[in-house]
Amino acid sequence: MSDTLETAVHDDATTTPSTRREADEPDRNRRLLLFASTYGTLVFLGALMALFTVLSEIILGDQRFLTGANLSLVLRQSAVLAILAGGLTVVLLLGEFDLSIAASMTLGGAMFAQFAQGSYVFTWPSIPFTDIGGGAILGTSWQANAMFALFAALLFGLIVGLLNGLIVAQFGVTAFIATLGMAGIIDGYLVKLTDGRSVPLPAGVTDAAQGTVLGWKAPASWNWIVEPFGKTFEFNLVGLSIPSIALAAAAVLFVLWVFLNHTEAGRRMDAVGGNVEASRLAGINVRRYRMAAFVICAVVAALAGIVLAAGRTGSAVTLVGNQSSYLLQAFTACFLGAVSLREGEFHIVGTVIGVALMTVTFSGLIILGVPGYAQTIANGVILIAALTFAGIARRAAAAT
């Protein structure tokens, strides 16, 4: 008994505050590494905004990054990419990918413009060697309505998604081949339809799409001056507005978030992406949900094209190659999002963070006068750096 008591007293005496700190050190390091792997992208986003704010003052002599005009421009520029990447997230969540999203986006914008200006109408099929058929189904003036043009253009996206899903899910063709081939088909169709020329949109459509929410602008009181370390920084947010297309993007992303996180179909898609065989054994129709994912992706991509044409450029680009940069940007945003908040999982909130990171980077580089080729390089560097950092932090946390 006395030996046991003596041992306990000895052990307690040897457990000093310094040894307890040493024992807690691995846990503390592991928590820090887990935080870095989970929230590193958000921290990097905040650091970039601070960096561009400071560099703008130092290099340019005044604040051009954190201003109302520039933040409004960032919101406007990010809207199209956010919608496109949001739709792509659904496909990536299921372990597939879609290389036709830029083509679907181009198709959506082009068909919307064609319908809106009355250049394209749905007609009855004609019977050869007769005068039967060939007339407009709903009347030319009715089909030129902006709302009809919107739904008709989305219908083309729906058809593309159905074809992609059918080829991949039903016929077993790899998504790489199927969607790459579909992009070529869409490109050829648009060249045949428009001769590769841009299609202008009616002024009424562009005026509405390029406006701001309720016409609101930040008042004159939104102008702050801070003086840290004897240096004066002016943050002039006067004139900050919320573009209508930014609100549209937020609405689309919210619907996708609700669908994926709070509906039975969304949870089943998540299950299919996590383990296909287990989902099949659980009675989930894997083919149906894979097809649905491609349909959602293509329809949302077509909507992104409509937003781009109406809310940004005022006309629809009809050559897929002219918008191919959106393909890489959308994938980059999604993969950046996969290392944000949820480890290695594609999700809408993460995609939004990825889009914000990319748009802020491009905006800052443009303001600082960095050449266009360097901006493209930065796109790839950000993706590689973010994924590498997250992987290193994750492995270090597991080894701790």
Per-region residue spans from a language model:
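Membrane-interfacial amphipathic/re-entrant helices at transmembrane-helix boundaries
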Residues: 3-85, 120-148
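Structural signal for alpha-helical transmembrane segments and their membrane-water exit/capping regions
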Residues: 44-63, 94, 193-194, 256-264, ...
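Single transmembrane alpha-helix segments in multi-pass membrane proteins
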Residues: 47-56, 68-122, 166-173, 331-349, ...
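Inter-helical junctions in multi-pass inner-membrane proteins, predominant
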Residues: 61-73, 190-197, 237-240, 257-266, ...
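Alpha-helical transmembrane segments within multi-pass membrane transporters and channels
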Residues: 122-183, 353
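Transmembrane helix-bundle core of multi-pass membrane transporters
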Residues: 128-141, 147, 179-262, 312-323, ...
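Transmembrane alpha-helical segments in multi-pass inner-membrane proteins
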Residues: 295, 301, 311-380
